[in-house]
Each structure stands twice: as structure tokens, then as C-alpha cells.
Amino acid sequence: MPVYIREYKQLGREAYGGAGVAIQAGLEPAIKQQAPIAIGASSVQSEPFDDDTALVLITTNAICHIEFGTNPAANTNKHRLAADAAQFFAVKPGSKLKVAVITGT
């Protein structure tokens, strides 16, 4: 089962391009769709996020644990995502962060 990572530069707005109220979704089109990461018994890292990425959408078909960092290592004590989860995370642009994934229960 893979984890999918979609990168966004900014949040969507009620009035596109204006000063409308931010909505809890990335502004499409996303700036990058990473190759899926296979979830397994060992921690696996994503590619570094794009310099303009400020928001990532992580989706997964299976229970897993994730960790963010410049050289992250996920384990079963890290942030848990439920099966069929889709969750946004804010990241600092230009920080060269990655996400690591490992299977969980």
C-alpha cells in the first residue's frame, strides 16, 4: 500500500486570487505530485519538498506512521495515520523537508 504526497504553495481562498477567507484546502493545481511511497516494515523517505511548498496533503490506503525532517526516520511511536486517511500539514518553504513512512497498526 502506498502513501501519496501532494505539495501546495498556498491555501485556497473563497474568492480566488483575492483577500477572501482561507479555506482548508490547497490551491489547485498543486505544484508537485510526488511518486507514491511504498509502506513497509522499514522507514522510507520521500523526495525533498519543493522550495515553494508550504502545505502537503498526505493520503494513505493503510495504517502508517510518519515523521517530517531533513533526514527523518519514522517508527511506530511517530504520528499515526489511519487507513484511508487524507491530512494536510503545513511546512516551512525552502526547508528541504521530507516525510518518512513506516507501516503501523
Which residue ranges define each predicted feature?
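Noncatalytic modules at the cell exterior or secretory-pathway interfaces
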Residues: 54, 89-103
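Short, flexible beta-strand-to-coil junctions
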Residues: 58-63, 101-105
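Short beta-strand/loop motifs in extracellular/secreted proteins, especially
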Residues: 3, 54, 62-64
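Short, solvent-exposed S/T- and G/P-enriched segments that are highly enriched in secreted/extracellular
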Residues: 39-44, 76-93
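Short loop/turn positions at the edges of beta-strands in beta-sheet-rich folds
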Residues: 50, 60-62, 93
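Surface-exposed ligand/attachment interfaces on beta-rich extracellular proteins
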Residues: 18-52
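Short, intrinsically disordered N-terminal pre-domain segments
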Residues: 1-28, 103-105
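Short, surface-exposed beta-strand/strand-loop-strand elements in extracellular ectodomains
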Residues: 59-76
